[in-house]
Amino acid sequence: VTAVATGLAGLAALCALIAIRMPIAYAMMLVGGIGISLLSGPAVLLSQIKTLAYGQFSIYDLSVLPMFVLMGGLATRIGLSRDLFRAANAWFGWLRGGTAMAAIAACAGFGAVCGSSLATASTLGRVALPELRRARYSGALATGSLAAGGVLGILIPPSVVLVVYAIIVEANIVTMFMAALLPGVLAVLLFLLTIALIVLVSPAAGPRGEPVAAAEFLAASRGVIPVLLIFLVVIGGIYAGLYNPTPAAAIGVFLVAAYGFGRRGLRVRELREAILETAGTSGMIYLILFGAEILKIFMSRAGLPQAAADWALASGMPPMLMLVLLLLALVALGCLMDSLSMILLAVPFFWPVLVELNGGAYQGADGAGFAMSTEDLKIWFGILALIVVELGLITPPVGLNVFVISSIAEDVPMRDTFRGVMPFLAAELLRVGLILGLPALALWLPGQLGG
């Protein structure tokens, strides 16, 4: 049995374990551990585990993850989502479909301090859904807009999945944060346009609300100021080169906690709950990272990434077509697993293929398969991959965001939620097409701020 055949058998076993609902971290560790033992012996496996147990968990860039998770946990507990939705509803609520637009805007704002799609969908679902139903919005538009708005938490910086992608492909985290900003803004604009088109076709789906008084408008708008200041200090400081993401995340935690204690009566019990929740979430993330690294070593020893790259070159397939096929594969994976696991499992296979098609790891723009340097390809593919990961969160039949919102909106059938999310899915596909055709949407801002 060849090493490549062993690797393929390992992949099949991994898919089977995922299908029977074994936790992805344990599935990757089991398959990777057995594979390394078969190819190189148990002694090599034990040596790798000993090295990884320290080396993987002591990577400096990974220390940013617990901080961003804690920042999101604190933001949820002090009611920032409620303030954001109240302000956005004061701005948009008088428009037809305006309350749904307010939900999208609030999701974008909360994603800027949370970094998690499921947390954004869950938090804003509880805040905005009662108001949407009170305003007599259709169940499909109310739940569909919230499920779609939740995906903004993945791409808008800071993003946990974006950090993990940057570490996998050895990209600069700050550069990835820069690259994600314009595509994130584009998503918000496309979602707002989608809602406008829905209510244009079906006015009853999103009735017009009453304009608010000037005093109420100003009072509601003040609720945005804390989020805006936190975003400017954390992300603006990173963009300005004042500090790197790890201290920026710590500063963000301090600011959110200080605001919570000073203005919102954050209790020590709630802080303790947020810290314990962060410990559990971070432990899960690190365990998945450890399992992914074990699996990656097995696949490398089996020669699968190189075999895939060699096959791609020998196929003569145009690089852009290969990229589209890989993105479609990511969409399919999104129906089986969560976004973090998908990135950890797929990127180590897909990235070497794209590097070879582009001309190698040190390829410049001249003569490159994708007409850009491999460093730029790293950024461009990362943004595309994360958008496709977003698609998986709202794609039938296993869109996790849809299940989260459906668990909150018990009076709305899940089929209505999936029906409501379809127009937003079309908007996401349009965004993928725009970034495929105009890579500058992802590359322009890093080029301008890179100096």
Walk through the language-model features, giving the residues of each.
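Alpha-helical transmembrane segments of multi-pass membrane transport proteins
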Residues: 1-451
